[in-house]
Amino acid sequence: TRQFEGKAVTITSALSGSYNAAMAARELYLQEHPGAKVAVFDSLSTGPELRLILEKLQELTAQGLPFEQVEAQTREYMHHTRLLFSLQSLHNMAQNGRVSKVAAAAVGVLGIRIVGTASAEGTLQQLNKCRGDRKALPELLEHMQKAGFHGGKVRITHVNNPALAGTFLEQLKAAW
């Protein structure tokens, strides 16, 4: 009989206990099923970068590659992806204590956009503060260029702002 093979990709361990929980579950499963193959990937990110990793994992698995090769190539791919984001609101970060409620309110009232990234350690880091979307979008493109982006797969997500996502897509296509 064929042994079980499982793969899990979690949100960054710097923001959530999902990775630790998945690793604990992996260890328990392997104790009961010693021949099983289970890989757990700490994305060190969230959102669209997490989706890129999942898509690569699915693509490699669909090719029928051996488990170890899928795992190794996915881990290598993760070194070539990056998360950049622009936040219009810091409400959720204030709710979970990551920023003060006063700072979150000021960002909203002043129309400040926070441009940031996921660090190599999986924490969210601010890169810039901009007044409005018109300044934030070019900042995102500039940071993509600084990170060495030369075209390729990009995932754009939005939270109830499809118009802004569409504008960014147009600017992205024009740049690359």
Where are these regions (language model features)?
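Mixed-charge interfacial surface used for oligomerization/domain docking
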Residues: 7, 18, 22-27, 33-39, ...
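N-terminal glycine-rich phosphate/adenylate-binding segment common to multiple enzyme folds
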Residues: 1-19
